[in-house]
Amino acid sequence: MSDTSVDASVEKTTKDLKSKDKELVEETENGKDKPANGNAENEENGEDGADNEEEEEVDEEDEEDEGEGDDDEGDEDDEADGATGKRAAEDDDEDDDVDAKKQKTDDDD
């Protein structure tokens, strides 16, 4: 008898879960129409869509410009990286000095 009652409760929960799943699916479908940022009016009027198209065109032009003349710009970038590497090495030396001072003060205590 206990098996029958367990099966009945399992069936009820399964039915409940199925109905809850349907409710969640409906809520999700309804939520897709609403933008997260709350600009529903602008999107419906097409205002944001026009802005996005203009931004995409500008991005494409930038990519084309970057492709031209990379040979000349590459040398300058290498020089800048080399200078930065030297600074990084100098900064490491300074950090070592600070650590040594800290060790001395720890020994004095």
Curated annotation (Swiss-Prot):
Keyword hit for Signal: no
Localization (cell): Nucleus
Span list, region Disordered: 1-109
Keywords noted in UniProt: Nucleus
Any single GO BP term: positive regulation of transcription by RNA polymerase II
Gene Ontology molecular function terms on file: histone binding
General function of this protein: May have role in testicular activity.
Family assignment from sequence similarity: Belongs to the pro/parathymosin family.
Record-given protein name: Prothymosin alpha
The species this protein was found in: Pelophylax lessonae (Pool frog)
Upper lineage: Eukaryota, Metazoa, Chordata, Craniata, Vertebrata
